[in-house]
Amino acid sequence: DASFSSWG
């Protein structure tokens, strides 16, 4: 999820 958070 943290990775996707970077994408927005």
Curated annotation (Swiss-Prot):
It comes from Periplaneta americana. Belongs to the kinin family. Mediates visceral muscle contractile activity (myotropic activity). Keywords: Amidation, Neuropeptide, Secreted. The modification Glycine amide is found at G8. It is found in: Secreted. It comes from the Eukaryota. One of its GO terms (biological process) is neuropeptide signaling pathway. One of its GO terms (cellular component) is extracellular region. Its main location: secreted. This is Kinin-2.
